[in-house]
From Swiss-Prot:
It is found in: Cytoplasm. CDD domains: S1_YloQ_GTPase (cd04466), YjeQ_EngC (cd01854). Its cofactor is Zn(2+). This is Small ribosomal subunit biogenesis GTPase RsgA 1. The gene is rsgA1. It comes from Lactiplantibacillus plantarum (strain ATCC BAA-793 / NCIMB 8826 / WCFS1). Belongs to the TRAFAC class YlqF/YawG GTPase family. RsgA subfamily. GTP binds at residues 112-115, 167-175. Residues 63-224 form the CP-type G domain.
Amino acid sequence: MKIGQIRQSLSGFYDVYADGQMYRTRARGNFRKRRITPLVGDNVEFDAATPQEGYVLNILDRQTQLVRPPVANVDLGIVVTATTEQEFSTNLLDRQLVALAVAGIEPLLYFAKTDLLTDEVYQQRLTLADAYRQIGYQVICERTAFSPAALAAVKTALAGHVAVVMGQTGAGKSTLLNHLQPGLALATGEISQALNRGKHTTRKVSLIPIADGLVADTPGFSSYEVFDIAANELTHYFPEFVRLSVDCKYRGCVHINEPQCAVKQALAAGELLASRYDNYLQFYETIKNKKVIYNKKK
Protein backbone atom coordinates (compact mmCIF):
# COMPACT_ATOMS: atom_id res chain seq x y z
CA MET A 1 0.00 0.00 0.00
CA LYS A 2 1.23 3.49 -0.91
CA ILE A 3 0.35 7.01 0.21
CA GLY A 4 -0.02 9.74 -2.39
CA GLN A 5 -1.95 12.82 -3.45
CA ILE A 6 -4.71 12.96 -6.06
CA ARG A 7 -3.52 15.42 -8.70
CA GLN A 8 -6.27 14.96 -11.30
CA SER A 9 -9.76 13.54 -11.62
CA LEU A 10 -11.49 12.79 -14.92
CA SER A 11 -14.36 10.46 -15.78
CA GLY A 12 -14.03 8.31 -12.67
CA PHE A 13 -10.25 8.02 -12.82
CA TYR A 14 -7.93 9.54 -10.23
CA ASP A 15 -4.29 10.26 -11.01
CA VAL A 16 -2.34 9.84 -7.78
CA TYR A 17 1.16 11.26 -7.37
CA ALA A 18 3.52 9.31 -5.12
CA ASP A 19 7.30 8.89 -4.97
CA GLY A 20 7.88 11.02 -8.06
CA GLN A 21 5.44 9.04 -10.22
CA MET A 22 1.81 9.30 -11.33
CA TYR A 23 -0.57 6.34 -10.92
CA ARG A 24 -3.93 6.00 -12.70
CA THR A 25 -6.47 4.68 -10.17
CA ARG A 26 -10.17 4.18 -9.53
CA ALA A 27 -12.03 4.45 -6.22
CA ARG A 28 -12.68 1.14 -4.47
CA GLY A 29 -16.16 -0.30 -4.98
CA ASN A 30 -17.62 0.52 -1.57
CA PHE A 31 -16.91 4.27 -1.88
CA ARG A 32 -20.10 4.78 -3.86
CA LYS A 33 -22.19 2.84 -1.35
CA ARG A 34 -20.72 4.93 1.45
CA ARG A 35 -21.26 8.11 -0.60
CA ILE A 36 -17.58 8.94 -0.50
CA THR A 37 -16.12 10.88 -3.42
CA PRO A 38 -12.36 11.32 -3.68
CA LEU A 39 -11.34 14.89 -4.49
CA VAL A 40 -8.33 16.36 -6.20
CA GLY A 41 -5.97 17.37 -3.40
CA ASP A 42 -6.89 14.40 -1.21
CA ASN A 43 -4.07 12.50 0.44
CA VAL A 44 -4.94 8.84 -0.05
CA GLU A 45 -3.84 5.30 0.61
CA PHE A 46 -3.82 3.26 -2.59
CA ASP A 47 -2.60 0.05 -4.21
CA ALA A 48 -1.28 -0.09 -7.76
CA ALA A 49 0.00 -3.18 -9.56
CA THR A 50 1.19 -0.90 -12.38
CA PRO A 51 1.21 2.87 -12.97
CA GLN A 52 -1.84 2.35 -15.21
CA GLU A 53 -3.98 0.29 -12.84
CA GLY A 54 -4.66 0.92 -9.17
CA TYR A 55 -7.32 1.54 -6.54
CA VAL A 56 -7.81 4.27 -3.95
CA LEU A 57 -8.39 2.42 -0.68
CA ASN A 58 -8.75 5.20 1.88
CA ILE A 59 -8.94 8.98 2.03
CA LEU A 60 -6.89 10.59 4.78
CA ASP A 61 -8.34 13.43 6.85
CA ARG A 62 -9.02 16.62 4.91
CA GLN A 63 -7.89 19.96 6.28
CA THR A 64 -10.22 21.94 3.99
CA GLN A 65 -12.82 21.11 1.36
CA LEU A 66 -14.24 23.28 -1.40
CA VAL A 67 -17.32 22.65 -3.50
CA ARG A 68 -16.53 24.98 -6.40
CA PRO A 69 -13.94 23.92 -7.42
CA PRO A 70 -14.18 20.42 -5.85
CA VAL A 71 -10.70 20.40 -4.29
CA ALA A 72 -9.47 19.23 -0.89
CA ASN A 73 -6.68 20.54 1.32
CA VAL A 74 -6.43 23.96 -0.31
CA ASP A 75 -4.60 26.26 2.09
CA LEU A 76 -3.96 29.36 -0.03
CA GLY A 77 -6.38 31.55 -1.98
CA ILE A 78 -4.75 33.96 -4.42
CA VAL A 79 -7.25 36.78 -4.87
CA VAL A 80 -6.50 38.56 -8.15
CA THR A 81 -8.20 41.95 -8.07
CA ALA A 82 -8.39 44.26 -11.09
CA THR A 83 -7.62 47.77 -9.87
CA THR A 84 -8.93 49.86 -12.77
CA GLU A 85 -11.72 52.22 -11.78
CA GLN A 86 -14.39 50.50 -13.87
CA GLU A 87 -13.50 47.04 -12.48
CA PHE A 88 -12.39 47.63 -8.89
CA SER A 89 -14.79 46.57 -6.14
CA THR A 90 -14.05 46.41 -2.42
CA ASN A 91 -17.39 44.64 -2.06
CA LEU A 92 -16.26 41.71 -4.21
CA LEU A 93 -12.86 41.72 -2.53
CA ASP A 94 -14.37 41.52 0.95
CA ARG A 95 -16.80 38.79 -0.18
CA GLN A 96 -13.85 36.73 -1.33
CA LEU A 97 -11.97 37.32 1.92
CA VAL A 98 -14.95 36.25 4.02
CA ALA A 99 -15.47 33.15 1.88
CA LEU A 100 -11.82 32.15 2.28
CA ALA A 101 -11.97 32.73 6.03
CA VAL A 102 -15.11 30.59 6.33
CA ALA A 103 -13.33 27.83 4.39
CA GLY A 104 -10.22 28.10 6.59
CA ILE A 105 -7.98 29.22 3.72
CA GLU A 106 -5.23 31.85 3.97
CA PRO A 107 -5.63 34.70 1.44
CA LEU A 108 -3.03 36.46 -0.68
CA LEU A 109 -4.28 39.65 -2.35
CA TYR A 110 -2.78 40.45 -5.75
CA PHE A 111 -3.73 43.87 -7.11
CA ALA A 112 -3.57 43.53 -10.91
CA LYS A 113 -3.64 45.99 -13.83
CA THR A 114 -1.83 48.61 -11.76
CA ASP A 115 0.15 49.64 -14.86
CA LEU A 116 -3.11 50.95 -16.38
CA LEU A 117 -3.73 53.39 -13.52
CA THR A 118 -2.89 57.06 -13.31
CA ASP A 119 -0.42 57.94 -10.59
CA GLU A 120 -3.25 59.43 -8.54
CA VAL A 121 -5.41 56.31 -8.70
CA TYR A 122 -2.42 54.07 -8.05
CA GLN A 123 -1.69 56.01 -4.86
CA GLN A 124 -5.31 55.44 -3.79
CA ARG A 125 -4.92 51.70 -4.37
CA LEU A 126 -1.60 51.72 -2.53
CA THR A 127 -3.23 53.41 0.47
CA LEU A 128 -5.99 50.80 0.43
CA ALA A 129 -3.43 47.99 0.14
CA ASP A 130 -1.66 49.36 3.23
CA ALA A 131 -4.98 49.43 5.10
CA TYR A 132 -5.59 45.76 4.29
CA ARG A 133 -2.03 44.94 5.38
CA GLN A 134 -2.74 46.61 8.73
CA ILE A 135 -5.76 44.33 9.12
CA GLY A 136 -3.38 41.39 8.67
CA TYR A 137 -3.72 40.44 5.01
CA GLN A 138 -0.77 39.88 2.70
CA VAL A 139 -1.11 42.26 -0.26
CA ILE A 140 0.94 42.64 -3.45
CA CYS A 141 0.43 46.02 -5.16
CA GLU A 142 3.40 46.84 -7.41
CA ARG A 143 3.38 49.80 -9.82
CA THR A 144 4.57 47.63 -12.73
CA ALA A 145 2.28 44.75 -13.64
CA PHE A 146 3.88 41.35 -12.99
CA SER A 147 7.16 42.90 -11.90
CA PRO A 148 9.95 40.57 -10.72
CA ALA A 149 9.30 41.68 -7.13
CA ALA A 150 5.58 40.92 -7.40
CA LEU A 151 6.13 37.51 -8.99
CA ALA A 152 8.82 36.64 -6.43
CA ALA A 153 6.39 37.46 -3.61
CA VAL A 154 3.71 35.19 -5.13
CA LYS A 155 6.21 32.36 -5.63
CA THR A 156 7.36 32.63 -2.03
CA ALA A 157 3.76 32.50 -0.78
CA LEU A 158 2.87 29.60 -3.08
CA ALA A 159 5.81 27.33 -2.26
CA GLY A 160 4.65 24.20 -0.44
CA HIS A 161 0.95 25.11 -0.66
CA VAL A 162 -2.15 24.02 -2.57
CA ALA A 163 -3.82 27.11 -4.01
CA VAL A 164 -6.88 28.30 -5.85
CA VAL A 165 -6.80 31.48 -7.91
CA MET A 166 -9.93 33.59 -7.67
CA GLY A 167 -11.21 36.84 -9.11
CA GLN A 168 -13.70 38.23 -11.58
CA THR A 169 -13.43 37.32 -15.26
CA GLY A 170 -10.67 39.31 -16.91
CA ALA A 171 -8.97 40.28 -13.65
CA GLY A 172 -5.68 38.76 -14.78
CA LYS A 173 -5.69 35.28 -13.23
CA SER A 174 -4.51 33.50 -16.38
CA THR A 175 -1.87 36.13 -17.09
CA LEU A 176 -0.50 35.82 -13.55
CA LEU A 177 -0.18 32.04 -13.87
CA ASN A 178 1.55 32.42 -17.24
CA HIS A 179 4.08 34.78 -15.72
CA LEU A 180 4.68 32.45 -12.78
CA GLN A 181 5.18 29.44 -15.06
CA PRO A 182 5.96 30.35 -18.69
CA GLY A 183 4.57 27.73 -21.06
CA LEU A 184 1.21 27.36 -19.32
CA ALA A 185 -0.69 29.16 -22.08
CA LEU A 186 -2.84 26.13 -22.93
CA ALA A 187 -3.81 25.34 -19.36
CA THR A 188 -4.62 28.94 -18.48
CA GLY A 189 -6.50 29.38 -21.73
CA GLU A 190 -8.72 26.54 -20.58
CA ILE A 191 -9.41 28.45 -17.39
CA SER A 192 -10.57 31.47 -19.40
CA GLN A 193 -12.75 29.35 -21.66
CA ALA A 194 -14.36 27.66 -18.67
CA LEU A 195 -15.07 31.02 -17.08
CA ASN A 196 -16.64 32.35 -20.25
CA ARG A 197 -18.90 29.33 -20.50
CA GLY A 198 -20.47 30.11 -17.14
CA LYS A 199 -22.12 27.01 -15.71
CA HIS A 200 -20.90 24.79 -18.56
CA THR A 201 -17.44 24.30 -17.12
CA THR A 202 -15.02 21.45 -17.70
CA ARG A 203 -15.46 18.46 -15.39
CA LYS A 204 -11.74 17.83 -15.35
CA VAL A 205 -10.02 19.07 -12.21
CA SER A 206 -6.24 19.13 -11.89
CA LEU A 207 -3.48 20.47 -9.68
CA ILE A 208 -0.69 22.06 -11.71
CA PRO A 209 2.80 22.28 -10.18
CA ILE A 210 3.75 25.97 -10.21
CA ALA A 211 6.59 27.67 -8.32
CA ASP A 212 7.09 24.78 -5.87
CA GLY A 213 3.37 24.76 -5.10
CA LEU A 214 0.18 23.38 -6.65
CA VAL A 215 -2.57 25.43 -8.28
CA ALA A 216 -6.05 24.15 -9.17
CA ASP A 217 -6.60 24.64 -12.91
CA THR A 218 -10.33 25.16 -12.55
CA PRO A 219 -12.41 28.32 -13.01
CA GLY A 220 -11.46 29.17 -9.45
CA PHE A 221 -13.03 29.49 -6.05
CA SER A 222 -16.48 30.84 -6.90
CA SER A 223 -18.72 29.83 -4.00
CA TYR A 224 -18.59 33.28 -2.40
CA GLU A 225 -21.90 34.51 -3.78
CA VAL A 226 -23.78 33.23 -0.72
CA PHE A 227 -22.27 32.71 2.71
CA ASP A 228 -23.33 29.49 4.44
CA ILE A 229 -23.04 30.94 7.93
CA ALA A 230 -25.39 32.52 10.45
CA ALA A 231 -25.60 36.30 10.36
CA ASN A 232 -24.26 36.63 13.91
CA GLU A 233 -21.16 34.63 12.90
CA LEU A 234 -20.13 37.08 10.18
CA THR A 235 -18.21 39.31 12.58
CA HIS A 236 -15.80 36.41 13.28
CA TYR A 237 -14.53 36.67 9.70
CA PHE A 238 -13.53 40.34 9.89
CA PRO A 239 -10.20 40.16 11.78
CA GLU A 240 -10.21 43.83 12.81
CA PHE A 241 -13.72 43.42 14.28
CA VAL A 242 -12.57 40.39 16.26
CA ARG A 243 -9.73 42.36 17.83
CA LEU A 244 -11.96 45.29 18.74
CA SER A 245 -14.95 43.27 19.96
CA VAL A 246 -13.28 42.44 23.28
CA ASP A 247 -14.01 46.07 24.23
CA CYS A 248 -17.68 46.00 23.19
CA LYS A 249 -20.10 46.34 26.10
CA TYR A 250 -22.18 43.34 25.09
CA ARG A 251 -20.87 39.88 24.50
CA GLY A 252 -22.05 38.68 21.10
CA CYS A 253 -22.24 42.25 19.79
CA VAL A 254 -22.81 42.28 16.02
CA HIS A 255 -21.75 45.94 15.75
CA ILE A 256 -24.94 47.35 14.25
CA ASN A 257 -27.44 48.71 16.79
CA GLU A 258 -25.75 47.91 20.10
CA PRO A 259 -24.62 50.81 22.33
CA GLN A 260 -21.00 51.16 23.45
CA CYS A 261 -19.76 49.11 20.50
CA ALA A 262 -15.98 49.30 20.07
CA VAL A 263 -16.22 48.64 16.34
CA LYS A 264 -18.59 51.56 15.74
CA GLN A 265 -16.42 53.76 17.97
CA ALA A 266 -13.34 52.87 15.91
CA LEU A 267 -15.29 53.59 12.73
CA ALA A 268 -16.34 57.02 14.01
CA ALA A 269 -12.73 57.76 14.94
CA GLY A 270 -11.54 56.92 11.43
CA GLU A 271 -9.64 53.86 12.62
CA LEU A 272 -11.58 51.41 10.42
CA LEU A 273 -12.06 51.30 6.67
CA ALA A 274 -15.56 52.65 6.06
CA SER A 275 -15.88 50.40 3.01
CA ARG A 276 -15.23 47.33 5.14
CA TYR A 277 -17.98 48.28 7.59
CA ASP A 278 -20.42 49.13 4.77
CA ASN A 279 -19.74 45.76 3.14
CA TYR A 280 -20.18 44.03 6.49
CA LEU A 281 -23.63 45.59 6.87
CA GLN A 282 -24.63 44.50 3.37
CA PHE A 283 -23.37 40.94 3.89
CA TYR A 284 -25.16 40.76 7.24
CA GLU A 285 -28.50 41.69 5.67
CA THR A 286 -27.92 39.31 2.75
CA ILE A 287 -27.24 36.41 5.10
CA LYS A 288 -30.30 37.20 7.24
CA ASN A 289 -32.53 37.24 4.18
CA LYS A 290 -31.00 34.13 2.63
CA LYS A 291 -31.38 32.11 5.81
CA VAL A 292 -35.16 32.50 5.64
CA ILE A 293 -35.13 31.02 2.13
CA TYR A 294 -32.89 28.15 3.18
CA ASN A 295 -35.18 27.19 6.04
CA LYS A 296 -38.14 26.82 3.68
CA LYS A 297 -36.38 24.29 1.47
CA LYS A 298 -37.58 20.70 1.67
